[in-house]
Amino acid sequence: MRKLFVWAVFCMVASLARAQEQRSVVQLVTDSGVVKIVLYNETPLHRDNFLKLVRDGFYDGVLFHRVIFGFMIQTGDSLSKHAEPGKIYGDGRYESYKIPAEIHYPEIVHRRWSVAAAREGDENNPQRESSMCQFYIVYGKRFNDDMLDEEQERLDRETGGTVKMTPEVREIYQKYGGTPHLDGQYTVFGEVVEGMDVVDKIQRVETDDNARPVGDIRILKATIVE
C-alpha cells in the first residue's frame, strides 16, 4: 500500500513538472508556407502579450516589412495590413505601449531560428523595452573563432563590455549560426520549431533599397495550436 502511495505522489509531481515545462506554440500561416513558433516561459511578459495579440487577430494580414538576407525577417506592424506600394513600415510611432525587457543572456541567445522582439534604439530607449507587436526571426550565419573574436569586439563597443560570450555561446554560433552582435540587447522570447524552410525562403526574396520585399509577403493567419 505504501509503495502505491509513493508511486501516486511521484506521478503527481512528474505531472506538475510537465505542466510547468509545457510551452505555448503559435502557428503562422503565411503566403510562403507555415511556420510554428514555441514561446519561452522564461519570458512571460512577452509570451503573454504575444498570445493576446494572436487571439485578437492582430497579426492576421500583416507584412514581413523588413527582410535582410543572411540576417533576419521582421514583421508585426499592423499598419502594413493595408500597405501602400514602396512605403516604409515598422517605425512603431503608433504603438500604445512597450514591454519591459526580459533579456536572459547567456542562457538565451540569438541563435538561428530564434524569435525576438524589435525595439527602438538605446538613444531613445535605454531600458531596451520591446515593441508591443513587432518581432523578427533570426537567420544570421555560422562563425569561426576569428569571426567570433570580431563579434566580441563589436559587443564590447556597443554594450560597454557588459556582454561576454561564454565558451558555450561561442559553440552555439559555430554550430548553428545566428546574430551574436544582438545578444544582451534584445529580448529573445521563442524559436521556430517547424517551417525553417519557409523562413529561409522568405529571407532570400528580392527587396527594395529599404529592405522591404518587392512582392508583398504576409502572415495570413496566426493561431495558438498548443
Predicted feature residues:
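Hydrophobic h-region of N-terminal signal peptides that target proteins for export
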Residues: W7-A19
